[in-house]
UniProtKB/Swiss-Prot annotation:
Function: Mutations in this gene cause a clear-plaque phenotype as a result of efficient killing of infected cells by P4. How this comes about is not understood.
Descriptive protein name: Protein cII
Domain of life, per lineage: Viruses
Origin species: Enterobacteria phage P4
Database matches in NCBIfam families: sce7726_fam
InterPro entries, per database record: Sce7726-like (IPR047729)
Length: 264
């Protein structure tokens, strides 16, 4: 009997499937990548020779947001693939264009299988400003410096993008893909090392792909190693996950605990 799967369960199985197919060699994987000014979040993104997004429609999802997601993802990534439960396959196939991939997952006896319904194709010619939108402000400055374009450090991000847009599309695209791979290299490698070592992965391992969690897990040991259980009661736990969901995980540091404010 088929088992109903949630998004994270499908995601773990999908990563294993992509790995076995050789699609993750020299690739960086990004969990929950935000695009279009954080208006959308791709369930899984891959940066290798191209930028690809995978949107999962699990047994517990609906298709009511699909059209909006497709519009944004197709304008933001070079290839988009919808990974869906069997009950959605027919409707998804009707809604997507020929360049969008469609993969159906099926669960049976604790195993998950994937079937390619439509391959889709890579379109590696996005708008210059779409590519530039993937960069952090510091990375934009690195791009300008790399090609000898002078600028003031006080310039707003929009002005930096205008300056960078004078570069060729190929130069921008190459820099952006390299920057994304470098930015997420550590978290991706932490996760992929488990697959390289033939270790079994689980939903809990998705935390390895979170920069914020990785950063806080290391810092919190330093900050609170000298605190007793009694003194920890003076701290308030920060909902890091909620902050990351709202603002993205490209922040310099989020503390796990803050001192409680006493008003008297």
């Amino acid at each position: 009997m088929a088992e109903l799967l949630r998004e994270q369960e499908v995601k773990i199985a999908l990563i294993e499937w992509l790995y076995k197919k050789g699609m993750l060699s020299d690739a960086t994987i990004i969990n929950e990548m935000v695009v279009a000014n954080w208006s959308r979040r791709a369930d899984l993104a891959i940066a290798n020779g191209s930028l690809q997004a995978f949107e999962i429609k699990s047994d517990f999802d609906s298709l009511k947001r699909l059209d909006g997601q497709l519009k944004i993802f197709k304008s933001s990534f070079e290839k988009v693939t919808i990974v869906c439960a069997p009950k959605f396959t027919s409707e998804v196939s009707k809604r997507v264009s020929s360049d969008v991939g469609v993969v159906e997952f099926q669960s049976n006896n604790s195993s998950v299988r994937f079937k390619i319904i439509q391959k889709g194709r890579v379109c590696s010619r996005l708008n210059k400003f779409v590519y530039l939108g993937f960069l952090l402000k510091s990375e934009l400055k690195d791009l300008l410096n790399q090609y000898g374009i002078t600028f003031s450090n006080e310039l707003h991000r929009d002005c930096l993008e205008v300056l960078a847009s004078k570069l060729s599309l190929n130069k921008i695209r190459e820099f952006v893909i390299t920057s994304i791979k470098n930015r997420y290299h550590a978290t991706s490698n932490d996760f992929l090392s488990r697959l390289h070592g033939n270790q079994e992965i689980s939903i809990n391992d998705l935390a390895l792909l979170s920069k914020a969690k990785r950063r806080n897990n290391s810092l919190v040991k330093f900050e609170f190693k000298a605190c007793s259980e009694k003194s920890l009661n003076e701290y308030h736990k920060v909902d890091v996950d909620s902050i990351v969901r709202k603002y993205g995980d490209d922040v310099s540091y989020i503390p796990e605990k803050v001192l409680k404010r006493v008003v008297g």
